[in-house]
Amino acid sequence: MFSLKQPKPSFKSYLLPLQQEDKLNPETKIKKLKPVLLPGEIVVNEVNFVRKCIASDTSQYDLWGKLVCTNFKISFITENSVPFQRFHYKNLLLGEHDVPLTCIEQIVVVNDTKRKQKILSHNQKLKFNPTELIIYCKDFRILRFRFDEAGPESAKKVCLALAHYSQPTDLQLLFAFEYVAQMYHKLDKVNGIDPGGGGDFCQRTPLFESYSDWDREIKRTGASDWRVCSVNEGYMISTCLPEYFVVPSSLADQDLKQYSHAFVGRRMPLWCWNHSNGSALVRMASIKDLLQQRKIDQRVCSGITRSHPLRSEVYKCDLDDNVPSIQDIQAAFSKLRQLCVNEPFDETEEKWLSSLENTRWLEFVRMFLKQAAELVYMLDFSRRSVVLQEEEGRDLSCVVASLVQLMLDPYFRTIIGFQSLIQKEWVMSAYPFLDRCNHLKRSDKESPLFVLFLDCVWQLLQQYPAAFQFTETYLTVVHDSSRISLFGTFMFNSPHQRVQQSTEFAIGKNIQLGEEKGLKFPSVWDWSLQFSAKDRALFNNPLYIGKSVPCVQNGAVKSFKRTKKNYSSTMRGMPPSVKNGMSIQQEIMPRRNSLILKLKPEILQQVPVIPGNGFEQYFRDWFSKPADLHGVILPCLHGTHIQIWKLCYLRWTPEAQINHGGFITAFHKISLLASEIEVLQSRLRQYRAYPMATVTSPVGEQNQMFFRPDELHSSNGSLDILSSSFPFSPIGNLCRRSILGTPLSKFLNGAKIWLSTETLANED
């Protein structure tokens, strides 16, 4: 999967790097270093005197320490700090040099003397003593460790242990089970949170595990002709459905039981969302009983039609024919990973864009956005209910249904709303996270559909930054959390599997469940388990204008305080001369990748047009008006608008970073302005309430922004710590060729480019 050859230099230095003695100081107390362990976490194997490589061409910045393999992570423990690494982002579950076992993609061991290298798999034998260990991670990191001073047998054992525990064959071997078992036995809490999570975000996020959550969603959207069905309570009909779901009121429970056997996996039609005009979004699996297919199809569509106030005809969309398959998506993502991880920068720089295009990843992102935009037209303009159909109804429909709701409903563009959307359309709708994320190393079922969805959301966030309450840091953290085997949110193929497997595990461990349906795993939405309140402020978007509390009246989402609709086009990442992505005249000398190119008819033809339905006109009309960020948003589908998600895919690549630059510099300034506005508003409220009292500033912890005016002169407020990968740091987590200390790196850090090499050599 990955190239095993050593990378060539990415940048040529005019100075020989300062070499430090590789031999370890005998006085170093590495043996006394201890890992930080979670409840249920045990040390499987460890090796002392390991060197973590920071750059492949020099040992000057390498770190010495202990490499520890546990049943949860691979951990490198050192007393040294990484040079040039200054950032204020810390995961409370994982150390700076820790990687969860479920985040490991591939393990390669090397013996320099024998010139041998091998990809380690589960329960494989190793016939040589490794001198080097290379770990390829699912988040595109590369970690390199040298065993020059370590005991050969100890190094061999830790490599074999890592291969064994990072490739489990049984679901109950994942760390979350041991963690929860310890919490139940000790009746304790972690960071003040119960085993199943608590936290502010978690408590306010509907999990859709109960009847009441679905009922509230019906009322929120005004779906008066739909009802919550409990026919699958106890998973009596289907193990691929939630216990509670929403169906047309005209369909009786007996009808559902009768027709369920005809659907693949017995996945009957599931209601997703209702428009204020009465049109509904529904998803279902294919009908496998060909003899009764027409009869059942008519009965289901008739029930959906009767739930519409206009009795509009249902529009069916077969996703298996309209969007790429899960196999094609996996192939594209593998090529993207290969491009971002393996190839040396200097070899791929000239052909990087063409290589990116050949992966087809951005093409697939665009195709899903186009499909969702077409369905937005059907629901919003044509006022027709839409039925999403695919073979099993639990893969492609998760992506499309979620994108449609994001474009139509501003509630899902808030943090709580977005989390409830993932719970409703992914977790409770039985998206197979276990198989698609490949937690058990069954590569034949792997496909990054959830990553694709987050990428599509990121595209919308880039185009409409003021429409979303969350930031791309939040999206990246959600992506990373799907690789941590601690949260039940992204660990199972279905809610039924969670209940079944956890109940079996509880019986084996003699855990008393009481009235609970299975073990209660921590929820990923309890962000206090991973991040401090300060770091969680990075989730808040200072550009977000929908900060007023939304309410629902007859299905229409409204706001108590509405802002002007005529927003500046620059807030959407577009030049001022463009109205919603459209321009009347083309520039006289347009740039190669200018966004001010005229949106010609042939460009619009790239969007699927249904004959006679006016989709093209709807698309044109929408883009000819200022965007209402409290209403419908449509994606800009021109090739220049679909970009690579650099913070997620290229954050560990030093060559791709911009020191003191990138979007974070603007984010820094906007956050400071937003913080000052928040302070002034607080003072104004205090003055209006108590005119004669002394007006004070709000408590710092109550400020929603990460960057604050009161910290302007501290390290947090300084641009020195910022780069385009903020809050992540590429230094120390990727063994690329070192650019530290070269004229180029000094120029990027503000040095004058005409300094001689002698001058640079004399600098500290």
Swiss-Prot record:
Residues of the Myotubularin phosphatase domain: 208-649
Cellular component GO terms held in the UniProt record: cytoplasm; membrane
Coiled coil (UniProt feature): none
InterPro entries (UniProt xref): MTMR10_PH-GRAM (IPR036004), MTMR10_PTP (IPR030573), MTMR12-like_C (IPR022587), Myotubularin (IPR030564), Myotubularin-like_Pase_dom (IPR010569), PH-like_dom_sf (IPR011993), Prot-tyrosine_phosphatase-like (IPR029021)
Any one of the GO BP annotations: phosphatidylinositol dephosphorylation
Origin: domain of life: Eukaryota
Any one GO molecular-function label of the UniProt entry: phosphatidylinositol-3-phosphate phosphatase activity
Pfam families per UniProt: 3-PAP, Myotub-related
Xref: PANTHER family: MYOTUBULARIN-RELATED, MYOTUBULARIN-RELATED PROTEIN 10
Family: Belongs to the protein-tyrosine phosphatase family. Non-receptor class myotubularin subfamily.
Protein name: Myotubularin-related protein 10-B
Lineage: Eukaryota, Metazoa, Chordata, Craniata, Vertebrata
